Amino acid sequence: MSAIDDLPPLREVIRRHDLAARKSLGQNFLLDLNLTARIARAAGPLEGVTVVEIGPGPGGLTRALLATGAKRVIAIERDERALGALEEIAAHYPGRLDIISGDAMEFDPRPLLNGDRARIVANLPYNIATPLLIGWLCAEPWPPWYEMMVLMFQREVAQRIVAHHDDDAYGRLAVLANWRAETQMLFDISPSAFVPPPKVTSSVVRLVPRAQPEPCDRAALEQVAAAAFGQRRKMLRQSLKSLGVDPAQLTAAAGIDPARRAETVPVSGFVAMANELANSRAIRTQA
């Protein structure tokens, strides 16, 4: 019998530790151990791997990660009520669960990794999911400190992450995500699997960092994407004017018709326009 079989049911853990989900923390607890195991398996073989988990709550996914064979799980939890539940799990897996009490938006796990590359696996709190992802995608140096991310989002956000040009959901987030990572939508999870049930379907996404993304000035890429998608129904010749460089110069560098709209431009086109923007600014600075 595995250690996870000896742990109490998650509903009992929630009751005993008074862990009613708090909307202010973006909490929706996933209690179905079959689904938590499926998420853990989506991160690939975990033997010898350190996993960083954000917002473990009562520890359903934490248990699955450890039972699946993770060498070590670093669990970052802001809700102090959950710490006791996590400590019970740690007692069943001596030396394999590090519990960090703090805000994931402010915590840097790299000093705890001892030079190893981790995998991030999490049912992210909805209210900080996108800012966390953007922070990880903007990590420097690159390749980053993690080798894979398996993350749960609201389905609408997940669609925006994996979208390609000409998709309705394609936008700034997709450009950044697909520039730096290979993205894949894995599976959906019904609201009924959570306590309390959210109003929307959730989706699990896998992101694997590209070893060598197309060379690009990241700040310029974000600026070009923001300008283009900020007025997504306008042609690029109009939407890019706010950047202070002739839009025709940017689109010409990418071989793009300035009459096109943002949603039709692939990531490589945004990279080319961003590099032209950065070069143009550098030349003006030197002049």
UniProtKB/Swiss-Prot annotation:
SMART domains attached to this UniProt entry: rADc
InterPro entries named among the record's database cross-references: KsgA/Erm, rRNA_Ade_diMease-like_C, rRNA_Ade_Mease_Trfase_CS, rRNA_Ade_methylase_Trfase_N, rRNA_adenine_dimethylase, SAM-dependent_MTases_sf
Catalytic activity: adenosine(1518)/adenosine(1519) in 16S rRNA + 4 S-adenosyl-L-methionine = N(6)-dimethyladenosine(1518)/N(6)-dimethyladenosine(1519) in 16S rRNA + 4 S-adenosyl-L-homocysteine + 4 H(+)
SUPFAM superfamilies: S-adenosyl-L-methionine-dependent methyltransferases
One Gene Ontology CC term in the entry: cytosol
Keywords, in A-Z order: Cytoplasm, Methyltransferase, RNA-binding, rRNA processing, S-adenosyl-L-methionine, Transferase
Transmembrane region(s): none
GO molecular function, one term: RNA binding
EC number, UniProt record: 2.1.1.182
Highest taxon of source: Bacteria
CDD domains, per database record: AdoMet_MTases
Binding site for S-adenosyl-L-methionine: 28, 30, 55, 77, 103, 123
Chief place where the protein resides: cytoplasm
Family matches, as Pfam families: RrnaAD
Protein's cellular compartments: Cytoplasm
Entry similarity comment: Belongs to the class I-like SAM-binding methyltransferase superfamily. rRNA adenine N(6)-methyltransferase family. RsmA subfamily.
Cited function: Specifically dimethylates two adjacent adenosines (A1518 and A1519) in the loop of a conserved hairpin near the 3'-end of 16S rRNA in the 30S particle. May play a critical role in biogenesis of 30S subunits.
HAMAP family reported for this sequence: 16SrRNA_methyltr_A
Full protein name: Ribosomal RNA small subunit methyltransferase A
The species this protein was found in: Rhodopseudomonas palustris (strain TIE-1)
Gene name tied to this protein: rsmA
